[in-house]
Amino acid sequence: MLSLTMLLLERVGLIIILAYVLMNIPYFKNLMNRRRTWKARWQLCIIFSLFALMSNLTGIVIDHQHSLSGSVYFRLDDDVSLANTRVLTIGVAGLVGGPFVGLFVGVISGIFRVYMGGADAQVYLISSIFIGIIAGYFGLQAQRRKRYPSIAKSAMIGIVMEMIQMLSILTFSHDKAYAVDLISLIALPMIIVNSVGTAIFMSIIISTLKQEEQMKAVQTHDVLQLMNQTLPYFKEGLNRESAQQIAMIIKNLMKVSAVAITSKNEILSHVGAGSDHHIPTNEILTSLSKDVLKSGKLKEVHTKEEIGCSHPNCPLRAAIVIPLEMHGSIVGTLKMYFTNPNDLTFVERQLAEGLANIFSSQIELGEAETQSKLLKDAEIKSLQAQVSPHFFFNSINTISALVRINSEKARELLLELSYFFRANLQGSKQHTITLDKELSQVRAYLSLEQARYPGRFNININVEDKYRNVLVPPFLIQILVENAIKHAFTNRKQGNDIDVSVIKETATHVRIIVQDNGQGISKDKMHLLGETSVESESGTGSALENLNLRLKGLFGKSAALQFESTSSGTTFWCVLPYERQEEE
């Protein structure tokens, strides 16, 4: 009996080793988490059927004289029996996969056992089916609670399964005397070994999945902490100052040697090893980063040569580089470096991928918030500059004066003033409006200004109908026209022309132009215009700065406000995508 126990322990040990190996394969771990899906059930059927077949093939042959022999057997003599770990594999299949998997594995294992032959081989087909169904029932109960049977319960179920096996041998064997003799030899070793094996098998599954859950919990905590600490900086946009703070936070919270963030063209920040030559404001040094920016796909490398840094003393030996996206376009990279290649594991890769997705979302949210603030600022500045009490009362006084002279004209101006107020308020709630709406708002504004200063300036709007649904930021043309009226024609009472036009730039873009014949912009202010606030006698220039930021934020740097200025006048223009709002 002791010899049989030791031989069975060897077989169980083999099963346990294979179980441990499987549970350290990510695909199999994911399979265990999806065990209630039919696809996963069929895969579990195949895996546990292979376990069951191996249990049959590596069984211990017992003859009538109780002689034991262990090898790999495909066929057995008619007068011998087989002690094996088949019950363990069928039982675990049912506990993990439920009745379907347990029954399937039981049938496959039983049919193969009948094929192998031996004394009363049909008994083991019957017992295998019973064991699969009963183990599957206990597995189903655990599945409904979204759990696995406990280790102690698994051991008890293993004992019950072996007792069913012994009862089947006693009930269905033709030679009762031989059945009793066989049971007296194998019952205790098989009950002990297979129940312990079942408990160990289930403990490996439970502990591995629990360890993964704990790891995910730690990762989730780290990611949430990173999100909370980095979000305020992402709201500022991806610049050198914010990137430096973000890189420092990641370096402090993660086990990495260095962290770098780049834009599409330059290093924005580098914290940690290699910071002596990976210097912010420099062009991107590594070919690895350039490849990621070009392909838009994550890359992981484990050698200095693959990183592609040309500095001879660079300590960086492994890296993972993740693209950062905004609205589907690559805007930069997040790079994590390691001085020891062994520190870059599957866990770091998963965490890096998750961070890249989160950071890309934060960049988009930050940009959306920036646009919202800019739009609100545009509304406030527009209302302050154009709907100020001074503007309002001047318009009302003009209309009042016209009531006595030209009541129809006064009525028209009152409607224009009403429309102007309404359009300003509506524009403040949208990121883009149609060019047609923008021009209507401009016409309302011009009607009021021309009523106050008759004949002082001429406005020519030359826009083809096919462009009237092009989407533009609110106040785009209004700000440029107002800028010309306020600054271009100082002390000039007549001959002041402003031209507004839209022309085709490319098949997918249009150029929007506002041109005046004023005195031009002084050279000391030209390089500042649109980039920062410019103080003047009649304003700060912040409206143009705000407009330029909104254009670049909505459409990219290629849409930035551009201008040319001479003593004969100034031309402002921007190039926007030919995006049209469909007419209802």
From Swiss-Prot:
Record-annotated GAF domain positions: 311-362
Keywords: ATP-binding, Cell membrane, Hydrolase, Kinase, Membrane, Nucleotide-binding, Phosphoprotein, Transferase, Transmembrane, Transmembrane helix, Two-component regulatory system
Domain of life (superkingdom): Bacteria
Membrane topology of the entry: Multi-pass membrane protein
GO MF assignments: ATP binding; hydrolase activity; phosphorelay sensor kinase activity
InterPro entries: Bact_2-comp_sensor_kinase, GAF, GAF-like_dom_sf, HATPase_C_sf, Sig_transdc_His_kin_internal, Sig_transdc_His_kinase_LytS_TM
Catalytic activity, EC: 2.7.13.3, 3.1.3.-
GO biological process, one term: cell wall organization
Histidine kinase domain: residues covered: 363-580
CC per GO annotation: plasma membrane
Residues annotated as transmembrane: 6-28, 40-62, 88-110, 123-140, 155-172, 184-206
Reaction equation(s) it catalyzes: ATP + protein L-histidine = ADP + protein N-phospho-L-histidine
PANTHER family in alphabetical order: SENSOR HISTIDINE KINASE YPDA (PTHR34220:SF7)
Role noted for this protein: Member of the two-component regulatory system LytR/LytS that regulates genes involved in autolysis, programmed cell death, biofilm formation and cell wall metabolism. Also participates in sensing and responding to host defense cationic antimicrobial peptides (HDPs). Functions as a sensor protein kinase which is autophosphorylated at a histidine residue and transfers its phosphate group to the conserved aspartic acid residue in the regulatory domain of LytR. In turn, LytR binds to the upstream promoter regions of target genes including lrgA and lrgB, to positively regulate their expression.
Protein name: Sensor histidine kinase/phosphatase LytS
Organism annotation: Staphylococcus aureus (strain MRSA252)
